[in-house]
């Protein structure tokens, strides 16, 4: 079983990202779970969401405390939240940032085996006209993890958002997939 933990802020779409990733894996015939955890429920407050993906039915119902993958939608969280808490030794961290690998690693309390960086904010602004990075970051997740194909992510996005909005969000995911930089740490 692969466990993914998303870190974002209220209004950024972390919960939607967790759900879309689960749908993309479901499209590929995998068993999935996706669920949020809210602390203080207000726009801008830190939000955590979770996705589990497996080849067999998932019976566990707890939060994810030892993720295989951590996805950070808002780079300012690197300053205030230990996003790598419990990260497995061979874990992957995916960050929406324009900063360098060195700058990001300096902020992480635990070093991942693999670090993936993409400027999802710029991609979202250029593609959607809004700094909502949830769909763009899923392109980075597909590239960095290989858990799902980018085509499945695009299909799941279009299933979630109809018409032109779906097309634009799928385009953002594809662009992030192509622009994600991956580093072995």
UniProtKB/Swiss-Prot annotation:
EC number per UniProt: 1.2.7.1, 1.2.7.7
One GO MF term: 3-methyl-2-oxobutanoate dehydrogenase (ferredoxin) activity
SUPFAM superfamilies: Pyruvate-ferredoxin oxidoreductase, PFOR, domain III
Oligomer and partners: Heterotetramer of one alpha, one beta, one delta and one gamma chain.
Protein name as it appears in the record: Pyruvate/ketoisovalerate oxidoreductases common subunit gamma
Keyword set includes Oxidoreductase: yes
Domain of life: Archaea
Reactions mediated catalytically: 2 oxidized [2Fe-2S]-[ferredoxin] + pyruvate + CoA = 2 reduced [2Fe-2S]-[ferredoxin] + acetyl-CoA + CO2 + H(+); 3-methyl-2-oxobutanoate + 2 oxidized [2Fe-2S]-[ferredoxin] + CoA = 2-methylpropanoyl-CoA + 2 reduced [2Fe-2S]-[ferredoxin] + CO2 + H(+)
Gene: porG
Phylogenetic classification of the source organism: Archaea, Methanobacteriati, Methanobacteriota, Thermococci, Thermococcales
InterPro entries on file: Oxidoreductase_gamma_subunit, PorC_KorC, Pyrv/ketoisovalerate_OxRed_cat, Pyrv_flavodox_OxRed_cen
Keyword vocabulary terms for this entry: Oxidoreductase
């Amino acid at each position: 079983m692969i466990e993914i933990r998303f870190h974002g802020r209220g209004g950024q779409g972390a919960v939607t990202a967790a759900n879309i990733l689960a749908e993309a894996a479901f499209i590929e015939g995998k068993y999935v779970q996706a669920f949020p955890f809210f602390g203080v429920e207000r726009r801008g407050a830190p939000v955590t969401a979770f996705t589990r993906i497996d080849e067999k039915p998932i019976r566990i119902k707890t939060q994810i405390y030892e993720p295989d993958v951590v996805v950070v939608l808002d780079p300012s969280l690197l300053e205030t939240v230990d996003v790598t808490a419990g990260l497995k030794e061979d874990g992957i961290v995916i960050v929406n940032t324009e900063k360098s690998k060195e700058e990001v690693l300096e902020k992480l309390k635990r070093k991942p085996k693999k670090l993936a960086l993409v400027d999802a904010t710029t991609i979202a602004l250029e593609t959607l006209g809004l700094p909502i990075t949830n769909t763009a970051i899923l392109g980075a997740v597909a590239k960095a993890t290989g858990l799902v194909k980018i085509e499945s992510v695009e299909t799941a996005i279009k299933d979630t958002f109809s018409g032109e909005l779906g097309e634009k969000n799928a385009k953002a995911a594809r662009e992030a997939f192509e622009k994600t930089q991956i580093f072995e740490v």
